[in-house]
Amino acid sequence: MEKKMTNWGSRFLRNAALVLVGCGLVGAQLCAQEQKAAAPKSSSAAAKNALAGAMSTPAATAVHGQELTATDLSAFLDGLIPQQIEKADIAGAVVAVVKDGKVLFEKGYGYSDAEKKTPVSPQDTLFRPGSISKTFTWTAVMQQVEQGKLNLDADVNQYLDFKVPQTFGKPTTLRDIMTHRSGLEETIKDLFVGEEKELTPISKYLPSHLPKQIFAPGTIPAYSNYATTVAAYAVQRVSGQDFNDYLDEHFFKPLNMTRATFRQPLPESLKPFMSNGYDLGSGKPKHFEWVEVAPAGSLSASAESMAHWMIMHLQNGRYGEAQILKPETAIQMHARQDGWPASMNAMCLGFYEQNLNGHRVISHGGDTELFHSDLFLILDSNVGLFVSYNSAGRPDHGDARGDLYIRFMDRYFPAPAANEPATATAKEDAQSVAGPYKISRRFETNILAVTTVLDEAKIVADPKDNTIYLDGLFKKENGQPRHFLEIAPMLFKSVDGPEKVAFVKDGNGRRVCYLDFPFMVLQEVDVALDKQAFNYVVMGLGIGVVVLTILFWPVSAILRKHYKQSLMLDPAARKWRRWAKIACIIDLIYLLGFLWAFTLLQKLELGSGGDFKLHLLQVIGVLGGVGGLLTIICAMKSWTDSTQWVWYKVWNTLLAVGCVGFFWFLVHWHLLNFSLNY
């Protein structure tokens, strides 16, 4: 549910049918595969170490910004957000800023119901903050750690009534899950469902939708909604409370979050306050989004309630008289975790760093299909910022949340202009890191694995200025790629922005690219059969010859009839030719069926109810593969028949190669995988 990935990431999520995602490197020398989670410690020792680390963080360089006051915030945000929502065609937005334990500013902009012109109220209007919901799940985990009912470094399976796989011979821990290093494959089936009656308890959802483990736990970050839900289920089991009841008792009531709930449908008392969600503010409202993995993204909350949540975390677990976490537990939760390059943002326990202008900032973004939100905690200044938009908006108008955050930081917490010259090896290193990459948060073994090759990321070296750019990932407002210059060995910084990327090599010598958002990485594609260019050639040839063969079939018949020519083939050759044509038709039916299924998957409209149709489609694909063998026989027989034209023989050969390549593509990318967990 996290989609903090700008244009390229949005394309990935769209093509993968994901509604995911809202969504620092010189000193580290260990490769990603060798980086382990911290060794088990007692909670008190871990908290002391985390506190020491937090206290020893160098202070930001003193640069005077605008004084952070309600008056100045009003002038600043009133000039920015209305402009954003107008240009991007967003119906409404809400923002809250807290400082030193108090709500400093909160305001709604635009409409919660555009047709009725109902204004957004920061106190009452409910927005859907998506994956910011996860911060509640993580905080619940830490409460149970305090009570000794959960251990961050124990095998999570001891808290479950089903088994998370140990594919690599190593157990998955809650620390792995909270840092998004569970190693589990991406999964989206039934992430959202179409109506309330399709919702199932997480106790049933989790064992029936168990993904494969594609990385060793504690190694490669790969964001996971599923793993988050596993953590919530562990809380539910050890606490003995339904997760919704747990949230009400331990968070919403003591924090006076009167306009907040994870429940679906909303309680009757809250339904009148729910904002509509829109694709475009000028369009019609969409239905309420039913989130199957509720602990990962079903929160509905007002900005004021989210302000209380931020205050609690900024005050290390305290809100008013309520102590949600012990101070040492909160500090431990907010502390940077091991395993990320020193000069890049890292995961905390649930939160992740979004450091800017010399200030340490922990954050969490969130996205449903319609609502897009972000939460930032500027720890060294005791300031929190929450913003949410109730529309997807026009895709060509950039990232409103990211723009607001950077402008906010530059205004109130600016940094001096950095003088970071290029390294002497900038040209050589830019060329060495260029090439195709794949995202770690991906489908690897299920029917959506094909999205990995469709959305291959490319890092390109620009010889004109010795920079690199990431195809589609970091773009300026004008749509042009943002260029990065090497400022330290294998650390590249945007030439006109704060973004950084860094490269290390894993245990197999493949490059891993760390990004500003630390919950996933890019991994070098070094296998030719997995590269996009090769697969496009295979698919292009296969689809091309199949479609042309089908088209030529009636055309050739019409021409023969017109010129009164007979088909110069013996009965056996005619039979094989007929079977080859049927194989082509089957392949075309499969291709059209796959495009249909993929369209529904993009809209998250093909959940468990579509299993039979997908199985039928896979059977058609297998029949197409059998038909491919028939095209080989047809081609072989044509070459042994001296009466057939040479061009006919060549075409039969191309058809056989194309059909076999098409079938290889289906098998290689698991499109014929009869497991329907995806």
Segments (PLM) and residue ranges:
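Short, glycine/proline-biased beta-turn/loop segments that scaffold the active-site neighborhood
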Residues: 152-167, 255
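Bacterial N-terminal signal peptides
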Residues: 15-28
